[in-house]
Amino acid sequence: MNLLIDKITKDQLRSDIPEFRAGDTVRVHAKVVEGDHERIQLFEGVVIKRHGSGISATYTVRKISNGVGVERTFPLHSPRVAKIEVIRHGRVRRAKLYYLRALHGKAARIKEDRRKAFK
């Protein structure tokens, strides 16, 4: 049974996903259906967590919009996500950045990982 599930999900995995992790700033191009037409909506922010593996992997992106923190969780291999762009790599020492929820302004900044920026 497990081999069957692995075989089915392997076909669904996307290969165009860039390498990113918590602390990186990403721009997600999400497909949004409004009525009878579909458009692309951009969501740019800091990845605060990645969860799971395989077809069920997800990641959460946080941004500040009009002074209010907005977090959105996306499935990693979803066809509703048109493209993921990595804007900059952040240097953090945690896998889950929940502490950013309590920080405001300049305190919520993340240092850039210069070693990854040149690759």
Curated annotation (Swiss-Prot):
Functional note: This protein is located at the 30S-50S ribosomal subunit interface and may play a role in the structure and function of the aminoacyl-tRNA binding site.
Keyword Ribosomal protein in record: yes
Cited HAMAP family: Ribosomal_bL19 (MF_00402)
Lineage, uppermost ranks: Bacteria, Bacillati, Bacillota, Bacilli, Lactobacillales
Gene Ontology BP annotations: translation
Cystine pairings recorded for this chain: none
Pfam families xrefs: Ribosomal_L19
Gene Ontology cellular component annotations, sorted alphabetically: cytosolic large ribosomal subunit
Record keywords: Ribonucleoprotein, Ribosomal protein
Family as reported in the entry's similarity comment: Belongs to the bacterial ribosomal protein bL19 family.
PANTHER family, alphabetized: LARGE RIBOSOMAL SUBUNIT PROTEIN BL19M (PTHR15680:SF9), RIBOSOMAL PROTEIN L19 (PTHR15680)
Protein name (Swiss-Prot/TrEMBL): Large ribosomal subunit protein bL19
Organism: Pediococcus pentosaceus (strain ATCC 25745 / CCUG 21536 / LMG 10740 / 183-1w)
InterPro entries: Ribosomal_bL19, Ribosomal_bL19_CS, Ribosomal_bL19_sf, Translation_prot_SH3-like_sf
Molecular-function GO term, any one: structural constituent of ribosome
